[in-house]
Amino acid sequence: MVKRVFYIFGVCILSVMIFHEFEKNTPKETAENVAVFKESSGDPKEKLEKTAYLTFDDGPSEITPDILDTLKNKKAKATFFLVGNEITTEREQIVKRELEEGHSIGVHTFSHKKDEMYCNEVTFFEDFNQCRERIRQVTGILPKLHRFPWGSNNGYVCPIVDDLLAKLKKENVVSYDWNVSGEDSVGQNVPKAVIYKNVAKDLEKFDQPIILLHDSNSTKNTSKVLGEIIDLIAEKGYSFGTLDEREEYTFPQSWRK
């Protein structure tokens, strides 16, 4: 009986010594160690940084100053995809202001006429380059961001979109679709509550949502509800970024019409 007690006692002492030695030689989980682990773990379940990308198509317009005022007041950034023939002499200062206040700008189209720009590769790049050059004339910058009117999966561009994307990449131009839409251009002045609801229903499905909104005279309610949308995004824990900070995103090929 005594031998058995000593045996059990000895096993306990040995276990304590082994644990102490293991603990002594194991690096502490400092904040630095944790950060390195998170960066290099490669775990696909790991959350990406929550950054939202507000984007506005079809400007500049008469509501662009209101959009910029709201973004400035809310300390949010955005990306504007511009229409070349909307950059009138009177609106040149608006485009300059977009850049001055830390936003990004990209090419949308010059004409926004599908029957002209999507006829073939030649007509597409004529339209693209005309818009790009107009932006350069005003800002001195040749934009590197681009968005296809109606998205990269629309039926007009589908037959040639892969070739267009390849040629754009050779020009160091990056194209972006979206994964959240306010659906603010489906009709004339869509109600504010509808735009807000459309953004809210899909926002949290993504760690890096690209949010499609419009900057045009027929989407005036977008500028009126923008402050509430920005508040919602911030409340959900997102910061705001511009698309020049994000990798390319285009719709999957399976979505093409």
Regions found by a protein language model. Give the residues of each.
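Weak global preference for isoleucine
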Residues: 8, 13, 18, 63, ...
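Catalytic domains of cell-wall/extracellular-matrix polysaccharide-remodeling enzymes
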Residues: 112-212, 216-234, 245-246, 252-256
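Active-site beta->alpha N-cap acidic-glycine motif
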Residues: 29-123, 127-142, 248
